[in-house]
UniProtKB/Swiss-Prot annotation:
Organism annotation: Trichophyton rubrum
CDD domains per the UniProt record, alphabetical: Peptidases_S8_PCSK9_ProteinaseK_like (cd04077)
Keyword tags: Glycoprotein, Hydrolase, Protease, Secreted, Serine protease, Signal, Virulence, Zymogen
Residues annotated as signal peptide: 1-16
Positions of the pro-segment in this chain: 17-122
Domain Peptidase S8: from-to ranges: 131-421
EC number: 3.4.21.-
Molecular function GO terms recorded: serine-type endopeptidase activity
GO biological process, one term: proteolysis
GO cellular component: extracellular region
This protein's name: Subtilisin-like protease 2
Main location, first listed in the record: secreted
């Protein structure tokens, strides 16, 4: 993926093959949503100033509609559509013509005006057998057999109990047997679409976080927050969903018992990075994928968010897959190639996928796991705990990234040895 593209990060496979190189998605004018914009207001505005600004926008919009009705040339627009308030960050989306965009850009209350953009989902194909990822989580970075059925995953029996993992994605098949009734439907931002996961990506990610067989935190709850359908979405829907998650965590008093997973990536987009930063300031932990471009993740959103936990992908023998992004912004490496999890299409369906979309939920699951066994009162404490447990200097071809692989710290605790697969 290159400039302006934004997508989910599971890569396609053919049965029996290792990962092919992902084809870059070319960027063109079609990536911009015509006439749709995201407006970020300046920090420090009073409620009265924000209210007055929005009244001004609405009055200008009404005048535009009146002139349009009177026969003036131009395009009829929607005006303000949705409002977002994440901690102290105020934003809104809307439909405006070029003249209104110029007016908004000159407003003393406006920090920035960005065009809305399409996000694209990666195609996926089933590949059988992948059983190494969980064993790696408790192996202290020791290489594990790719296709062995005897890999042990050792973990504390609390296993994420009482913690909530929010999956901003394509939805989740909450009736899948892997979730044992611990998955619920939260928010669906896609108009005229059911909350059903028709693509599979969200169900796969949720299974890696909290599935009874494939999950890192086997007793955690998962919340489906649908911002993607089968193929694409826009920042409008992504921010609406992220805003809903922040509010739901806050209203439910779950800040130190909740984690957000974002297995998505696109070109750097400051409004979304700002939103992730406000979530951090609000006391909420976000885990994000580094991206699948094979490039420096500093140019990707939300990977470039400084206080999100950014996750690159590692293979079973401690090499970086060529698709995984890297760089100083990458905090940690986790299993991200040939990862088996639950899938769409049936309550027992499974699939094997690759990408930093699979790496990120390993760490989101670890966050949920650690929250259930240790008091971690802030995102800073969560990040410190996750990074303090990592094993250094194992990833080959990590470029200039911090070279730290994920580890759940089980040798510090009494452990449970489950049977898998």
């Amino acid at each position: 993926m290159q400039l302006l593209n934004f997508g989910l990060l599971l890569l396609p496979f053919v049965a029996g093959d290792l990962a092919p190189q992902p084809e870059p998605l070319l960027v063109g004018p079609s990536d911009i949503v015509p006439g749709q914009y995201l407006v970020t207001l300046k920090e420090g505005l009073t409620s009265a100033q924000i209210r007055d600004h929005k009244k001004w926008v609405s009055s200008v919009h009404r005048a535009n509609l009146d002139s349009f009705a009177a026969g003036a040339r131009g395009v009829e627009t929607e005006g303000i559509m949705k409002h977002f308030h994440i901690h102290d960050l105020n934003m809104y989306s809307g439909g405006f013509d070029e003249k209104r965009v110029e007016d908004l850009s000159r407003s003393p209350y406006v920090k920035s005006v960005h065009p809305d953009q399409h996000f694209y989902l990666a195609k996926t194909v089933t590949q059988r057998q992948a059983r190494w990822g969980l064993g790696y989580m408790s192996s202290k970075g020791k290489p594990v057999p790719l296709h062995s059925t005897l890999v042990d995953y050792s973990y504390d029996d609390k296993a994420g109990e009482g913690v909530w993992a929010y999956v901003l994605d394509t939805g989740i098949n909450v009736n899948h047997v892997e979730f044992e009734g611990r998955a619920i439907l939260g928010h669906n931002a896609i108009p005229n679409k059911s909350h059903t996961d028709e693509f599979g990506h969200g169900t796969c990610v949720a299974g890696i976080i909290a599935g009874k067989t494939y999950g890192v935190a086997k007793k955690a709850n998962v919340v489906s927050a649908k911002a993607f359908d089968t193929g694409s979405s826009t920042y409008n829907y992504i921010l609406e969903t992220y805003d809903w998650i922040i509010r739901n965590i806050t209203d439910s008093n779950r800040k130190n018992k909740a984690v957000i997973n974002l297995s998505i990536s696109g070109a750097k987009y400051q409004p979304f990075d700002d939103a992730a930063e406000r979530a951090f300031k609000a006391g909420i932990t976000t885990v994000v994928a580094a991206g699948n471009d094979g490039k420096d993740a500093k140019n990707n959103t939300p990977a470039s968010s400084p206080n999100a936990i950014t996750v690159g992908a590692v293979r079973w023998e401690n090499t970086r897959p060529s698709f995984s992004n890297y760089g100083k912004i990458v905090d940690i490496w986790a299993p991200g190639e040939l990862i088996k999890s639950c899938w769409k299409g049936g309550n027992n369906a499974t699939s094997t996928q690759s990408g930093t979309s699979a790496a990120s939920p390993h760490v989101a699951g670890l966050v949920a796991y650690l929250m259930s066994i240790k008091n971690l009162p802030s995102p800073s404490a969560v990040t410190a705990r996750v990074l303090n447990l990592t094993i250094p200097n194992l990833v080959k071809d990590a470029k200039d990234s911090p070279n730290r692989v994920v580890y759940n710290g089980i040798q510090e605790r009494k452990c449970k040895l489950p049977k898998y697969y």
